[in-house]
Amino acid sequence: MYLSRACEQGLVEEKTITEAVERLMDVRIRLGMMEDYPSPYANIPYDVVECPEHIALSLEASKRSMVLLKNDNHFLPLKQEQIHTIAVIGPNANSRAALVGNYEGTSSRYITPLEGIQEYTGEKTRVLYAQGCHLYKDQVEFLGEPKDRFKEALIAAERADVIVMCLGLDAGIEGEEGDAGNEYASGDKLGLKLPGLQQELLEAVAAVGKPIVLTVLAGSALDLSWAQEHAQIRAIMDCWYPGARGGKAIAEALFGEFSPCGKLPVTFYEGTEFLPDFTDYSMAERTYRYTDRHVLYPFGYGLTYSQIRYSDAHADVTDFGILEPVTVHVTVENTGTYPVQEAVQVYVRFSEREAYDPGYQLKGIRSVALECGEKKEVCITLSPRDFALISEEGKCLVHPGSYEIAVGGQQPDERSSRLTGQTVSTLFICKTGNVTEVEY
């Protein structure tokens, strides 16, 4: 309805609508949806549903997506032989809802973080559990007093050698139902703070004085600045919504069966006060491309249990024609003791950009498997489109001039360098020719 009106008013050209429809129909044709015979996707045999291969793939996705945000003095991985009692505390510790988010199917089995830790440790380690608080209400029981589960959480914390806090959100707090004011009913959350009494619970448990690993189960960014700065929180791992058996992956990550290697696909801000209103379509402060502010965790950031070294970053030449592709080379080496899946990132910035143009933008990424001590050369080719900027008229233009290309395991910002202790390599190349329009 609105698109039809926009077309009538000359706000959208009919050819633009046609191009969008053609793309949509192209995908449907390639999926076999327009054929006379039934699509193979409509006749998947039931015996492949939740088959061992799919379960293994789901578990691998859980492992690959986890992002290690903090790991003071290499506190993780935990050494089970040194732990007699572990306390698992928090509203998401034994929550199935926190595993799957929304748009999920029904699994034949769910493994929560609590269950994953219990299964991994077996009888060798005593596992204590306390819910601590409701996900967002002041009490767990309907007729309970406020903070009705705090005491049991503190008792468990006092008796533990290590505490695993499981906090965050679930689809009941963040979702796609209704408008931004529909928090707690599957709408958009109103802020970045941990909801309900979760922050207060975290601070109360930290006051006990035992080392804490904070695992966050959520589908979006949260303000974890207190946990990042507090010395008692030794490690923070963002597990997102890890899937039906996600608790198994969380336990294996905590105890070092593999190293978390994920990188953040979003920016974690410390607050929303400086962000523009939702109806303000200027890009100032929106995403890593348009902000120069200090952020909590930058886009592209993530730690591992290993150590990765980048060296010999270069391009074959430094001068390129306006529509010439640019191939970037870099050597990546795993100098640590854990195999990793490193995400090599390439960012591009036009040195002569206008104030409203974006800064560094991720234009190339390559996932590289590295065994301990292994070294690989990685080549990433950037197309002319990767150097283009969008004009105020909506045209996709490549400009002649100087470009900066940053290569490494993170974005080229001061905060990432401070968090990881590493820097990226910056190359300078020149595009020669005239301003040229390219396809989106």
Predicted regions and their residues:
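C-terminal non-catalytic regions of proteins with extracellular/luminal or membrane-system context
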Residues: 1-14, 26, 48, 56-440
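Conserved, charged catalytic cores of large soluble enzymes
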Residues: 22, 26-45
